[in-house]
Amino acid sequence: MEKFFPIWDITTWPGNQRDFFYQGVHRHEEYLPCLLLPKRPQGRQPKTVAIQGAPGIGKTILAKKVMFEWARNKFYAHKRWCAFYFHCQEVNQTTDQSFSELIEQKWPGSQDLVSKIMSKPDQLLLLLDGFEELTSTLIDRLEDLSEDWRQKLPGSVLLSSLLSKTMLPEATLLIMIRFTSWQTCKPLLKCPSLVTLPGFNTMEKIKYFQMYFGHTEEGDQVLSFAMENTILFSMCRVPVVCWMVCSGLKQQMERGNNLTQSCPNATSVFVRYISSLFPTRAENFSRKIHQAQLEGLCHLAADSMWHRKWVLGKEDLEEAKLDQTGVTAFLGMSILRRIAGEEDHYVFTLVTF
């Protein structure tokens, strides 16, 4: 299964992650048997399902769960799917490619099998993820799109042709998307069914804190502090944010700091957490450079959020006065991540910052 399904990699988040554990949102798994249900009784199964949610909420994990269950023949087994997971950057390459070549990359050396797969497009299940990392614009002019899955096309045309069902209209699409990208994709999608991932509810947040700290006095104190901070506790609906809050508050407790004084608001929790990464991950920074690079990082993050610009280029780094030493350090800390196939393009690992 690993040969055909090499996507169970460990997601990298900021920090050393020694204390990280993944606690799935139980309700997300409950969606699996319902993802392709008709919108109304006697209706047709949707051919396009958009799974939307905040960054880190679990969209990619759900996509991987679909792939895993498909590999075990437990996801709509009666459909005889042939499923493929694509990160949008795989589709949106700088060189022209055809959809059949994309499939061949997943199953190298199996041209006969690829031909057999493409002979039954109604059995294709395509999962598309990573729209926020696109470095080119989607095409919404139908006359510019293509029906031919054998034709070599620019990445933006190929992706837009798939999304619009101009190409492979019989195939079923599962699209993982953030709220901020919905308006970009919506004009292309044909009768999409929307599924929103809500993240942890209150009881699941409490359970996560208890699993992280154990049923200890320290854990009770941290949980009580977090629950009193309405904004901070609401942000904990995102699983990875919940972990970061736990990790950051634990650091403060271990240093003997009073949480109310050291973390008076939600922003201070994240600032202290990010600052704590520098002593262990950026020993080559002097105090002055440390401060300058951290200010540059904050400038970059604020500018990105204000302008809804998720892919950052060389000019953005220069404007924030981040030099190569700083960029390398932030890559090492997993605060920034280089986009695959794009030497000078980066994204924040977690947009919650």
Task: Indicate where each model-derived feature is located.
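Intracellular innate-immune signaling modules
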Residues: 1-353
